[in-house]
A protein has these predicted regions:
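Alpha-helical transmembrane bundles and membrane-interface segments of multipass inner-membrane proteins
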Residues: 1-168
């Protein structure tokens, strides 16, 4: 699904799934981790990718352990979904920079990540190097959009959205 999104949609595009307002595909690329947190430059990106590799190795061991110990199916499924997300992010980080012609990438001249226009295509001349690809995120579930009550301390009246993160 990630490859279909990356090669068929421009970044920022939003598609309602089955016409629902609360389930959308919203294509973004993320150089960091959840909620857009990042370690900064290319070195930080490499450290994050190596951390992902370590997490996937640990996750492989852990999934095997909980299956052998016959944990509940629900727990195994939840752990498996988390593991699948981590593995997908690792694959994106390791290889997407080498196999696509466009992607969110770090520009040392401005010390920031820059986006791109258009739709990415497969290419032998990637937009980045091994361990420096950006993660494709697209699942967005804005289930509740409202405002905090005005009497609420500090953030009273501010907009509130549950569930605002875009993930994969």
């Amino acid at each position: 699904m990630k490859i279909w999104i990356k090669t068929g949609h421009p970044t920022g595009e939003v598609v309602r799934v089955f016409g629902f307002d609360w389930f959308r595909l919203h294509f973004i690329e993320n150089p960091g981790m959840a909620w857009g947190w990042e370690f900064g430059n290319e070195t930080g990106k490499m450290i994050l990718t190596l951390f992902r590799l370590t997490a996937v190795i640990f996750g492989t061991w852990y999934i095997g352990r909980i299956v052998k110990q016959q944990y509940s199916k629900g727990f195994i499924i939840c752990a498996g979904l988390i593991y699948a997300g981590a593995l997908g992010n690792l694959i994106d980080s390791m290889f997407y920079g080498m196999i696509f012609d466009k992607g969110l990438h770090y520009d040392a001249a401005i010390n920031d990540y820059i986006s791109y226009g258009g739709i990415a295509q497969f290419s032998s001349n990637g937009y980045s190097s091994f361990l420096h690809g950006s993660v494709v995120d697209m699942l967005y579930f804005p289930i509740i959009k409202s405002n905090f009550p005005s009497w609420f301390p500090v953030i009273g009246g501010d907009e509130f959205e549950f569930f605002s993160p875009i993930f994969n």
